Swiss-Prot record:
Reported cofactor(s): NAD(+); NADP(+); FAD
Function noted in UniProt: Catalyzes the conversion of zeta-carotene to lycopene via the intermediary of neurosporene.
UniProt keywords, alphabetically: Carotenoid biosynthesis, Chloroplast, Chromoplast, FAD, Flavoprotein, NAD, Oxidoreductase, Plastid, Transit peptide
Signal sequence interval, chain numbering: none
Similarity field: Belongs to the zeta carotene desaturase family.
Full protein name: Zeta-carotene desaturase, chloroplastic/chromoplastic
Chief place where the protein resides: plastid
Species for this entry: Solanum lycopersicum (Tomato)
Pathway noted in the entry: Carotenoid biosynthesis; lycopene biosynthesis
Disulfide links within the chain: none
Annotated Gene Ontology cellular component terms: chloroplast; chromoplast
Length: 588
């Protein structure tokens, strides 16, 4: 997300303490046996790290073909110079693919740091501030392929194969996918045995899923995906209730999941979005397995990708924003980009390339598209998409908030304790959250300090106008309602980050307006998780869009080089006629 607006609070109180490697012998994930926490505690002997050669879904078989394209053929065309606007995951994915094919790549980013929606930075007190909570499903094969390519496959921590719901009063519900037999039986067992729903709701839930395209996905994944696409014009709630599902199931289970996926609830989310996930969960054993980075995204995700790009000869230009896309119209009416008007503080320059990629978020691409281009339906459709506001809150405590079994353990600071996983809740304004001191310890566990809760407030609309202090006050109160045992623990540091438009709002009927990566403008391409690809708006979707953008560019390499020669000849002709090209461009 190269150009979204974000606002950061000043910490209420500075956190102090020496950073330390997550201690061996720290309590790990708690195992639950009923509506309340059981007395069993699984103690993790060491932080679980895993490479990406195991516990990953095989998306090359029995999966929709568009979700994980085959490796591209070796490019044999002319070497191209490509300018990419935006150093988010989509832009960097595009860059990696193009560099691997031998092209020359420059990435321009208006911010001082890279990563877009998966970016992070360090504040003046040394605290890592993230743009949101990032969780990796086991079916993120395009992203995992990228991480393996750049040498970051050891940077993800595998969590217990269960989805945990924290209800008011500290009551825990689960979708437990740990089962001796894999898909689809592990999923059936998880839904039938969940203690998050009452028996009647579970039965109606099972009926609804049995009547869904998810069943067809077991034998015909591409046909099922087409059926799922055809359901884009109805909300998930409308579809689910029409198949016999209950409102209680939506409120207690599916709304928190929907908020975590797309920052909107089931009443406002397309059935396509939710059913895409369900189909993968049903057919791929590891699709529902969660991973989280072992530390901050800037160090363990964006950092390795940036290094790979630079080692391959790619260049990053930070704080350079694109102010205007310069273009010309040929005699036949076709359009092409002639350059990008860039600026950095008081500096200005025109960037020229053979191909241009706008790897922006929804508000970013809307600002970038020339007004004239909106006469084309392709570009005008983009303006029918809107981003969802989201607020991310970090709270550092002087104890372990999610430790529910042992009050004394929750007060000591020698060892980390609590729930090490992504956590959902139907009973707070933050639908999903995690204790990063447990889940991503390398940067977030600090010796002598406690939990670092990262809470994602969705929908973020009601919180956008509030002061940071008021937001912290409300979130802290809701945390206490979920974890009454945390009474008496104090918040020692906090941060608030507001993003006016994050993921695009995946509401009913919006999928047809998502643009392809190839545009009607001959040398102008798009990338971004909002663009057309078979997954949802996500890290995986962003990575896949980058692969698709690169493929489109390589497929028309000869034409792009011919266009570049044509443009150069026209510019030389203008110069020979005494036209000052630089003056002309400066006036645009």
């Amino acid at each position: 997300m190269a150009t979204s607006s974000a606002y950061l609070s000043c910490p209420a109180t500075s956190a102090t303490g020496k950073k330390h490697v997550f201690p061996n012998g720290s309590p790990g994930f708690l195992v639950f046996g009923g509506t309340r926490l059981s007395n069993r505690l699984v103690t993790r002997k060491s932080v679980i790290r895993a490479d990406l050669d195991s516990m990953v879904s095989d998306m090359s078989t029995n999966a929709p073909k568009g979700l994980f394209p085959p490796e591209p053929e070796h490019y044999r065309g002319p070497k191209l110079k490509v300018a990419i606007i935006g150093a988010g995951l989509a832009g960097m994915s595009t860059a990696v693919e193009l560099l691997d094919q031998g092209h020359e790549v420059d990435i321009y980013e208006s911010r001082t740091f890279i990563g877009g929606k998966v970016g992070s930075f360090v504040d003046r007190r040394g605290n890592h501030i993230e743009m949101g909570l990032h969780v990796f499903f086991g079916c993120y094969n395009n992203l995992f392929r990228l991480l393996k390519k750049v040498g970051a496959e050891k940077n993800l921590l595998v969590k217990e194969h269960t989805h945990t719901f924290v209800n008011k009063g500290g009551e825990i519900g689960e979708l437990d996918f740990r089962f001796p037999v894999g898909a689809p039986l592990h999923g059936i067992n998880a839904f039938l045995s969940t203690n998050q729903l009452k028996i009647y709701d579970k039965a109606r839930n099972a009926v609804a899923l049995a009547l869904s395209p998810v069943v067809r996905a077991l034998v015909d994944p591409d046909g099922a995906l087409q059926q799922i696409r055809d359901l884009d014009n109805v909300s998930f709630s409308e579809w689910f209730l029409s198949k016999g599902g209950t409102r209680a199931s939506i409120q207690r289970m599916w709304d928190p999941v929907a908020y975590a996926l797309g920052f909107i609830d089931c009443d406002n989310m397309s059935a396509r979005c939710m059913l895409t996930i369900f189909a993968l969960f049903a057919t791929k054993t590891e699709a529902s397995l969660l991973r989280m980075l072992k530390g901050s995204p800037d160090v363990y995700l964006s950092g390795p990708i940036k290094k790979y790009i630079m080692d391959k000869g790619g260049r990053f230009h930070l704080r350079w924003g694109c102010r205007e896309v310069l273009y010309e119209t040929s005699s036949d009416g076709s359009m092409y980009v002639s350059g990008l008007a860039m600026s950095k503080a008081t500096q200005k320059k025109i960037v020229k390339a053979d191909a241009y990629v706008a790897a922006c978020d929804v508000p970013g691409i809307k600002r970038l598209v020339p007004q004239k281009w909106r006469e084309l339906e392709f570009f005008d459709n983009i303006y029918k998409l809107v981003g969802v506001p989201v607020v991310t809150v970090q709270l550092r405590y002087n104890g372990w908030v999610t430790e529910l079994q042992d009050l004394e353990r929750s007060r000591q600071l020698k060892r980390a304790a609590g729930l090490d996983n992504l956590l959902y809740t139907p009973d707070a304004d933050f639908s999903c959250f995690a204790d990063l001191a447990l889940a991503s310890p390398d940067d977030y566990y600090i010796e002598g300090q406690g939990s670092l809760l990262q809470c994602v407030l969705t929908p973020g609309d009601p919180y956008m106008p509030l002061s940071n202090d008021e937001i912290i006050k409300r979130v802290t109160k809701q945390v206490l309602a979920l974890f009454p045992s945390s009474q008496g623990l104090e918040v020692t540091w906090s941060s608030v980050l507001k993003i006016g438009q994050s993921l695009y709002r995946e509401g009913p009927g919006k999928d047809p307006f998502r643009p392809d990566q190839k545009t009607p403008v001959e040398n102008f391409f798009l990338a971004g998780s909002y663009t057309k690809q078979d997954y949802i708006d996500s890290m995986e979707g962003a990575t896949l869009s980058g692969r698709q953008a690169s493929a489109y560019i390589c497929n028309v390499g000869e034409q792009l080089m011919a266009l570049r020669k044509k443009i150069t000849a026209a510019e030389l002709n203008d110069i020979s006629k005494g036209v000052s090209l630089s003056d002309e461009l400066s006036l645009v």
